[in-house]
């Protein structure tokens, strides 16, 4: 790839000094096979620790009351980012932050438990493709 048309700044963000494209994918080689396992942008870096939003979402989805969840990072001065979870519960189900934290403590390392939890009354917004 030579770069983005008339956009040197965007080109510099995705090409390294040797011209390799930084796709944002995380993977590993196992013999001749390349396994793509995650995306860099799906990671929250909290005080130098990489946290997979997908891993935290999967743990939250294990709770019977959860209909939808979205985990993301929010800026934090000291640690860089902190985790936040937006959760929509199933109809007629109840869950509070303390109960969720206890539930997650059995499934995740302490630093992976969201610092902030927002319970949404309505389903979480989606883009046109879902």
Question: Over which residues does each language-model region extend?
Answer:
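AMP-binding/adenylate-forming catalytic domain of the ANL superfamily
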Residues: 109-129
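AMP-binding/adenylate-forming catalytic core of the ANL superfamily
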Residues: 2-3, 8-13, 18, 24-112
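Short, glycine-anchored, charge-dense loop/turn motifs used at functional sites
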Residues: 32, 129-130
């Amino acid at each position: 790839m030579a770069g983005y048309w008339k956009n040197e700044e965007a080109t510099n963000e995705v090409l390294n000094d040797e011209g390799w494209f930084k796709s944002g994918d995380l993977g590993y080689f196992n013999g001749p096979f390349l396994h793509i396992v995650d995306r860099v942008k799906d990671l929250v870096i909290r005080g130098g620790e990489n946290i997979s939003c997908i891993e935290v979402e999967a743990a939250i989805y294990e709770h019977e009351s959860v209909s939808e969840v979205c985990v993301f990072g929010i800026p934090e001065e000291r640690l860089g980012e902190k985790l936040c979870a937006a959760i929509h519960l199933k109809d007629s189900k109840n869950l509070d932050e303390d109960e969720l934290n206890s539930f997650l403590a059995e499934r995740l390392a302490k630093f992976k438990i969201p610092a902030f939890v927002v319970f949404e009354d309505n389903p979480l917004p989606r883009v046109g493709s879902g």
